[in-house]
Amino acid sequence: MTIKSDKWIKKMSQEYNMIEPFEAGQIKVSNNQKIVSYGTSSYGYDVRCADEFKIFTNINSSIVDPKNFNDKNFVDFKGDVCIIPPNSFALARTVEKFKIPRDTLVVCLGKSTYARCGIIVNVTPLEPEWEGYVTLEFSNTTPLPAKIYANEGVAQMLFFQSDEECETSYADKGGKYQGQVGVTLPKC
């Protein structure tokens, strides 16, 4: 597997709609103000999070069980800035919709701007032929509230292309997160 360059990312997005909406360059300013950058980088694509969030809460004092997840553990929030409580986390989704080629695997890494503030992003790999909006998990590892900015860069996607197509893709398996649209909670 080799990491793919900006040229490949641009071609696949413009000709095959791999990323929509797609930004061919790096956007660092919006409305004459500096923002956390998003768009195509040398060997990746910096995604934005949309303005819809699910913020983790302990109001119900329940146990977090991935096999039987209680959606009441989250508070829905819509806005330009999400404040994550100390030592807690929030879910969001990308602005961009992805359509991953059959011979490609995508790995997500956090942006240093957030990591240096104690905010960690976690996303499992985007598997071959997975399609949809990516659900993002932000962990606030600090003892203080932390901000996430909607419609600005939050994570970088790295694209790895195999020398051969996989035998069974995510679409072939009928993956449970295929085609997700909004912030998607755990499914078991």
Swiss-Prot record:
Positions of dCTP binding: 111-116, 135-137, 156, 170, 180
Enzyme Commission number, as recorded: 3.5.4.13
Acetylation found in the keyword field: no
Coiled-coil ranges per UniProt: none
Example GO biological process: dUMP biosynthetic process
A Pfam family per the record: DCD
EC category: hydrolase
PANTHER family: DCTP DEAMINASE
Family that this chain belongs to: Belongs to the dCTP deaminase family.
Function: Catalyzes the deamination of dCTP to dUTP.
NCBIfam families named among the record's database cross-references: dCTP_deam
Protein name: dCTP deaminase
